[in-house]
């Protein structure tokens, strides 16, 4: 991999595609972690569907995740790769999120920025998007190039019928644009992805996922990480990451640190 090009793409575009970043062993360990999450739903596990024959399952912040994921994370090539792209030696695991879309027609994942839901900011933040099924470019995660540079929009409530309905109606944050209705006005990028490939993006990137169609299955694991320069950045309402007492202890602009987050050795 050309690290110079990857760094430039990540800093300027907010997203980089890394073919075959995970070898067979690392991919199998990631899949085992994903399967553990499906078999052990956490308190935030949710199933969305528009039809009875479609599954759209999502889970995150599972309290058993660290114990179940630790071995996979410590053996994974991802921490080293991400710190090489960041050009910083420190990396912590923030949280996991799993998605399962299969069966009939399921809605697309509305456009949003993860950072709208997270009280953390900084350049050295990353979401590692891993698929366990081949995904065509037309069916893949989509990004608005360079949108991590701002603005930070009000989060979507993911309401049926209005993808831009604001999470914080009274907050002084711009409302999400209706990107699906104005796609030609945005520089949208996506990638055809095979198992073992990695899509790495900054959580402030505007992104959304295509729907699934009958006969399709899309199993996705996302792993979120933060680095040394990350700071606490309060949101207008309740926000992640979830760590006991962190939102009462940290003040605006404090270094983002908490012993509950697993520090990894690149």
Task: Please tell me what each predicted stretch does.
Residues 89-91, 95-96, 107-109, 124-130, ...:
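Generic beta-strand structural signal
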Residues 40-51, 156-158, 195-200, 204-266:
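Non-heme Fe(II)/2-oxoglutarate
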Residues 97, 113, 130-134, 143-145:
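Short, structured patches in soluble enzyme cores that scaffold and shape functional sites
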Residues 119-137, 192-193, 200, 224-227:
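Short, conserved beta-strand element in jelly-roll/cupin
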Residues 137-206:
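Double-stranded beta-helix
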Residues 1-13, 18-111, 116-119, 236, ...:
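Non-heme Fe(II)-dependent double-stranded beta-helix
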Residues 114-116, 125, 207-212:
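Glycine-rich phosphate/pyrophosphate-binding beta-alpha loops
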Residues 78, 103-106, 123, 134-137, ...:
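Short, charged/polar surface micro-motifs in flexible loops or helix N-caps
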């Amino acid at each position: 991999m050309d690290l110079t090009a990857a760094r430039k793409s990540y800093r300027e575009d907010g997203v980089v595609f890394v073919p075959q970043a995970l070898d067979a062993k690392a991919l199998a360990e990631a899949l085992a972690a994903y399967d553990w999450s499906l078999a052990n739903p956490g308190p935030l596990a949710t199933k969305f569907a528009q039809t009875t024959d479609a599954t759209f399952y999502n889970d995150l912040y599972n309290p058993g995740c660290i114990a179940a994921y630790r071995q996979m994370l410590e053996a994974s090539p991802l921490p080293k790769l991400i710190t090489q792209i960041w050009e910083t030696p420190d990396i912590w695991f923030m949280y996991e999120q799993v998605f399962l879309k299969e069966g009939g027609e399921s809605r697309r994942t509305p456009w949003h920025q993860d950072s709208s839901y997270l009280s953390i900011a900084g350049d050295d933040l990353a979401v590692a998007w891993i698929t366990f099924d081949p995904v065509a470019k037309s069916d893949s995660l989509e990004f608005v190039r360079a949108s991590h540079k701002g603005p930070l929009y009000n989060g979507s409530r993911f309401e049926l019928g209005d993808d831009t309905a604001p999470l914080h109606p009274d907050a002084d944050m711009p409302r999400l644009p209706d990107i699906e209705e104005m796609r030609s006005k945005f520089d949208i990028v996506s990638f055809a992805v095979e198992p073992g490939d990695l899509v790495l993006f900054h959580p402030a990137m505007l992104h959304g996922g295509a729907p699934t169609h009958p006969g399709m299955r899309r199993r996705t694991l996302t792993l979120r990480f933060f680095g040394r320069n990350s700071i606490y950045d309060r949101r207008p309402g309740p926000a992640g990451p979830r760590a006991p007492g962190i939102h009462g202890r940290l003040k605006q602009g404090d270094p983002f640190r908490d012993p509950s987050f697993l520090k990894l050795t690149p």
